């Protein structure tokens, strides 16, 4: 694995438990210190749900994807960026350098709309590999929020697993690890 990339998607449901979160941070720090090139894409569903409930907004889902209007995308973006910053700062506390990558800072994902009825839910259309590799070459861990920019720099929410698969495929990573509490079928990328 010395010169190989590993993409890790860590689900928001898994990271609710602070002990699990802290173990994840420790594991990432160890992998980085061992010289393994890792890219992390995180989820955030439970945190998004909590913030929407605080605003008395009921989520509607189609095919497992949250219907996302203009008001909801603003909340989703804020929650995912805050969570991203939490991961980066926790890694820094362990002495591991990481870089936030999201729609407001270092965006690497260009998107197209998934389906009109889903609103601002996108599908990755283009990944900026060069930017990710520049971070890795500095011995830092890129921490990527599942957000992308579409036409006119409109923010789109992306399913975390979909974002992780797109990044892994684009980078031709050796492994894609999906850390989740949801049963998944084996997916070939």
Set out the residue ranges of the language-model regions.
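Nucleotide/pyrophosphate-binding catalytic subdomain
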Residues: 1-187
